[in-house]
Amino acid sequence: MDSQEPIILEKSIKIEEVIKIANTSIIDIVTKTVTPEIKAPYELVDVEYDKMGSDYILSILVDKEGGITVEDTSDLTNIISPLLDTIDPDPFPNQYMLEVSSPGLERPLKTADSLKAAVGSYINVSLYQAIDKVKVFQGDLLAFDGETLTIDYLDKTRHKIVNIPYQAVAKVRMAVKL
């Protein structure tokens, strides 16, 4: 094959998917860089890298027992910002704004440990594939044994229990019961 010939992909890839793949590696690199430096009493909850309008935002979500303060976010920003400048090669294709903040009421539950700690809480679960034609469940997390989430959710006016394999879960976050 001549090096001048175009490469034809068998499967078309949307630009959004390419950006998502690139963002995943940026998130992984940032997570590996900042995790060792976020020490107790703080806990790294999540790292997000998204485009908002024409701006790129790198969000570092941090929490601690009793919640974080504005002073905490300022102190953490002063630790994290210089660390990001040391990453070589620079993983960021564009300039970005660094945001260090609390995960808020609808904090993501990224680990098995965070799910175990959330038993008894009201959560929102998004699945890779639907279970009984439902792809998003919102309800009380009754149990989590490391492999299966048991959720009590409302289907119209009836309470139902669903067991969801952990491998089927795309995203989980705390939810606010209205």
Swiss-Prot record:
InterPro entries (alphabetical): Ribosome_maturation_RimP, RimP_C, RimP_C_sf, RimP_N, RimP_N_sf
The protein's role, per its UniProt record: Required for maturation of 30S ribosomal subunits.
Protein name per Swiss-Prot or TrEMBL: Ribosome maturation factor RimP
Assigned keywords, A-Z: Cytoplasm, Ribosome biogenesis
PANTHER family cross-referenced by the UniProt entry: RIBOSOME MATURATION FACTOR RIMP
GO BP term, pick one: translation
Family the UniProt entry places it in: Belongs to the RimP family.
Name of a matching Pfam family: RimP_N
Native source species: Streptococcus pyogenes serotype M18 (strain MGAS8232)
Cellular location(s): Cytoplasm
Main location group: cytoplasm
Gene Ontology cellular-component annotations: cytosol
